[in-house]
Amino acid sequence: MNGSQQICFTDSAGKALFSIPENGLLCLFYGNGDRHFAVCHRLDDTHAEIDGVNYSLPDFAKRMKHNQISFAPA
């Protein structure tokens, strides 16, 4: 896999928010003030492994919104 490939994160409606590089870090912000850093691996244009779990990127955003967790590049 090309090391310059990007993972494009979207909101729950599928609108592009930001990109991080393959093997980049995502910061998750919880409502109680906790933060968690997750390593991300690109699977294809719309899927990534985030902290060891495979996600469709729009589904990941929906899950984070439902759980009131915000996310941003680390």
Enumerate the predicted regions with their spans.
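Generic low-polarity alpha-helical segments
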Residues: 1, 7, 24-26, 38, ...
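Mixed-charge, Lys/Arg-rich low-complexity intrinsically disordered regions
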Residues: 1-17
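Acidic, low-complexity, intrinsically disordered interaction modules
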Residues: 20-54, 58-60
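Intrinsically disordered, low-complexity, charged/polar segments
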Residues: 53-74
